[in-house]
Design a protein with these regions (language model features):
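Residue-level detector of solvent-exposed, low-hydrophobicity positions
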Residues: 12, 18, 38, 172-174
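Extended, low-complexity, turn-rich repeat/linker tracts enriched in Gly/Pro/Ser/Thr and Asp/Glu
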Residues: 167-174, 184-189
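Aromatic (Trp/Tyr/Phe) and Gly/Pro-enriched flexible surface segments
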Residues: 20-158, 162, 187-238, 245-314
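Bacterial Sec-dependent N-terminal signal peptides
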Residues: 1-25
Length: 315
């Protein structure tokens, strides 16, 4: 009898905790709406028409025009580039079937640019979704984050991000380095990852500064062959640098990233993280990135893939 009462008590406690949590879906995070873009590449590259996708309201756009990312909270690794008048499109993130609905598939691929039928440039691109926007057309590959306004205004303090997830991870310890001319291998293990940085930003003389309010960063070292629903990525607030779980890549920029954002003058400039905020401070912006690879731009393991669906905040 006493044992039964204990089990019943624990059950009610668990129900109470669950009832206290509030779940808020991110806009378009159910992956059921996509904008399809048709971009015609330059004749020098073969003149093919490529499909690009944006995680945004259902729509079809034709023509080599920059996308207006104010229509969505999501930036994406799919890029329309126009360098010196040469138009190019690259697609590494796309909708994929899941049951009767749709999820997002993020792939790491080698993107090859052929000029007049000959291989000229090869770059490694990891499929990525992130909160922010891309400043199109991309005009240079020399500064991968120079065209990205990273993060969105955000003043909430969620407990965690939850989503449905599946992953394909190559166990080999090698990473392809493909920055343009030629490819090489380095030792390492490329892993899909999810990270969340809550920041308190301010601007001085056109420069953007930030303190880190909240942090979550999780890498997937092994494949997840079957869907894992409601996967939880907990957010920790304040200075986590002395915690047992802390790893260097969770640290302040540049360890945690080398991202940029648009300042009040409309210029994309570096986000300078200058310290950890107190745990009780309120953020001004949030960065969320979901990506098929954990290495810097143009490094990765082709064949790695990440599937995601139903992205939500927990409060």
């Amino acid at each position: 009898m006493k044992k039964n009462l204990t089990i019943l008590f624990l059950f009610f406690i668990a129900c109470h905790i669950i009832a206290q949590e509030r779940i808020v879906p991110l806009r378009y995070g159910d992956m059921e709406q996509w904008t399809v873009r048709y971009i015609k590449e330059s004749k020098l590259l073969g003149g093919k028409t490529k499909q690009l996708y944006v995680l945004a309201a259902t729509d079809t756009l034709r023509g080599n025009q920059p996308y207006d990312f104010s229509k969505t909270i999501w930036g994406i690794s799919n890029a329309y580039a126009n360098v010196a008048g040469i138009a190019k499109a690259a697609c590494t993130t796309q909708p994929d079937k899941r049951g009767k609905g749709t999820c997002a598939r993020l792939d790491t691929r080698i993107e090859t640019v052929k000029v007049l039928g000959m291989i000229d440039i090869q770059v490694c691109i990891a499929g990525t979704l992130f909160l922010g926007e891309v400043n199109e057309p991309v005009k240079s590959a020399n500064d991968p984050y120079g065209s990205i306004n990273m993060g969105i205004p955000f003043t909430d303090k969620p407990k965690a991000l939850i989503l449905d997830i599946k992953a394909k991870v190559n166990p080999e310890r090698k990473v392809i380095k493909a920055l343009g001319l030629g490819m090489s291998e380095i030792e390492g293990h490329d892993e899909p990852e999810i990270y969340i940085f809550l920041q308190k930003r301010w601007e001085e003389n056109g420069k953007i500064y930030a303190k880190r309010v909240g942090t979550a960063r999780h890498r997937f070292a092994e494949s997840i062959p079957e869907w894992r629903n409601d996967y939880r990525v907990d957010i920790n607030y304040g200075d986590i640098s002395k915690e047992s779980y802390f790893k260097k890549y969770m640290g302040l920029f540049p360890d945690g990233g080398q991202f940029k954002a648009r300042n009040s003058q409309g210029k994309i400039t570096t986000i300078n993280e200058v310290g950890w905020a107190d745990a009780d401070e309120t953020p001004t912006h949030v960065i969320v990135m979901i990506t098929a690879g954990c290495y810097p731009a143009f490094y990765g393991c082709p064949g790695n893939a990440l599937w995601v669906d139903n992205i939500r905040w927990i409060y």
